[in-house]
């Protein structure tokens, strides 16, 4: 419903851009409308939620529009889902999407030094792991220090033991390691963090 309310005159940008080899490795870019994008615009890579089992980037145009309307370049990426892959797979996909975003930020009119990751619900977990656990960016020659910060919207950051059957599959429960949890990596040297949750959100 929200996507039908999006004001399409506030953004432009390429859609269906490939960032990796899998059919799910696609992203859309939302650049602020109204002239040339300044070369120092902040860039936000957004990961949607859906219990790691569902979701499509086309369902989140309202996120891209909201960011673009405020002068922010938004990138909304699809990633592989469970049961096709376990958590290692979708985190590797998110790392690839971030690599693409960092490499293309300047050509989109953004500042490569002002790139952030943001996610909602399950997507907030993905964003947190890229920002806190260096294992996912290391194979790409990147570190979390490349991020200007990360934003988590109603995300799960410490959810062992796992009780949801779908999430159990995604994380290989009961053999889920403790270092699969973002809280395991919380430290004072992490990128700047903004965590948001609704007042009446039940955890």
Regions found by a protein language model. Give the residues of each.
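N-terminal cap/lid segment of alpha/beta-hydrolase-fold proteins
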Residues: 1-38
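Mobile cap/lid helix-loop segments that gate and shape the active-site cleft of serine hydrolases
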Residues: 6, 22, 155-185, 191
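Short beta-strand element of the alpha/beta-hydrolase
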Residues: 39-50
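Hydrophobic beta-strand anchors of alpha/beta hydrolase catalytic cores
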Residues: 44-46, 74, 193
């Amino acid at each position: 419903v929200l996507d039908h309310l999006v004001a399409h005159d506030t953004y432009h940008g390429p859609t269906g851009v490939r960032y990796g080899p899998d059919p799910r490795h696609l992203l859309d870019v939302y650049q602020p409308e109204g002239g040339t994008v300044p070369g120092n615009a902040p860039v936000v890579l957004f990961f949607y939620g859906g219990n790691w089992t569902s979701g499509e980037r086309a369902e989140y145009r309202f996120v891209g529009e909201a960011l673009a309307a405020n002068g922010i370049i938004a990138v909304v990426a699809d990633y592989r889902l469970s049961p096709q892959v376990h958590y290692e797979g979708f985190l590797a996909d998110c790392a690839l999407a971030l690599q693409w975003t960092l490499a293309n930020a300047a050509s989109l009119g953004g500042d490569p030094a002002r790139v952030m990751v943001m996610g909602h619900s399950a997507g907030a977990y993905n964003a947190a792991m890229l920002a806190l656990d260096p294992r996912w960016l290391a194979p790409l020659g990147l570190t979390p220090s490349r991020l200007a910060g990360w934003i988590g919207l109603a995300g799960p950051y410490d959810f062992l033991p796992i009780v949801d059957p779908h999430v159990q599959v995604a994380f290989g429960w009961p053999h889920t390691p403790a270092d699969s949890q973002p809280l395991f990596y919380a430290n004072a040297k992490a990128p700047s963090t903004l965590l948001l949750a609704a007042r009446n959100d039940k955890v």
